[in-house]
Amino acid sequence: MLKTYHIALACVILAVVVLLFGGESLSLEEWQEVCLNVKNHFLHNEELSSLSVIILEIRLPRVILALLVGASLSGSGVVMQTILRNPLVDPFLLGISSGAMLGVAMAIAVVESNIAILAFFGAILPSLAVLAMNRVLGNSVLSLVLSGVVLSAFLSALAGAIKFFVIPQKAQAIVVWLLGSLSLSSYKDCLIAFIGLSLGFIPLFLLRWRINLLSLSDAQSLSLGINPVLLRSLCLVCVSVASALAVSVSGTIGWIGLVIPHVARLFFGANLQKLLLSSLLMGAFFLLLADVVAKTITPYDLPVGIATSVLGAPFFLWLLFRTRGV
């Protein structure tokens, strides 16, 4: 039977393999030189060699960022599906992806800097707007979902208009970000994603047994001493922060928040006591694997969002047939 530590071990093994063999593989002698050079760099301030720079400044931050972003998106997806009692929602329902895309489009078209900052605010503000709209409309799950769909469509239209009017070079930059990419990863990006993961999921871990009760009706949750409206709003804020910070450094990477929670439920059931951690780890593994595929299937460094769609869409279709007994 699959255990959580099996997934964690798989993440570690895949990360090591990517570091060793990602791009061009290094010989044993070259690895010995890299290890010695890195040790001397930290102990004796020796200058890093070109191979050491490739490992430490290119491969390692990309691996770390893939793990962090994948965990944030998949964990956000499983929480969203639980609290909204809908297996077809993902973190981008709240307008996070379309809002981030609008922020990036404005950054590229107007200021040409601070892309991550505008992407974050573009992602977080629609989420707060959806929560405010839902409060006005009666705090129902249906109004929350519909508010998110409407706002996402509106923001996507605005971003599309900006992309239409800018020069082709800037439009191409917007499209590349829209498809999601880890090619320009840095340790600063890793820190941002880690902060989002920590701020979002430490509260969710502490409250996961209460969040389980949101899978029941609001009336049943109230009878068990849970305020469903308050708890659902808190969960959505946590999910929004984690997803917004992840999207701000990686672009919009689809399917992870939708597919991975379903895969995790096949092995761990619907109880968040085990499901939440397993979803985080599975999402981390999946995005790192997708990034490997994106780098190897063509001579070019494809946006990782293309790889997640290629891997995720057929697998999700298989899940649908499997659950219906087809």
Curated annotation (Swiss-Prot):
Keywords: Cell inner membrane, Cell membrane, Ion transport, Iron, Iron transport, Membrane, Transmembrane, Transmembrane helix, Transport. InterPro entries: ABC_BtuC-like, ABC_transptr_permease_BtuC. Its main location: membrane. GO terms for biological process: siderophore-dependent iron import into cell. It is a multi-pass membrane protein. GO terms for molecular function: transmembrane transporter activity. Pfam families: FecCD (PF01032). It comes from the Bacteria. One of its GO terms (cellular component) is plasma membrane. The chain crosses the membrane at residues 7-27, 64-84, 91-111, 113-133, 142-162, 164-184, 187-207, 241-261, 275-295, 301-321. It is found in: Cell inner membrane. Belongs to the binding-protein-dependent transport system permease family. FecCD subfamily. Part of a binding-protein-dependent transport system for an iron chelatin; probably responsible for the translocation of the substrate across the membrane. This is Probable iron chelatin transport system permease protein jhp_0822. The lineage of its organism: Bacteria, Pseudomonadati, Campylobacterota, Epsilonproteobacteria, Campylobacterales.
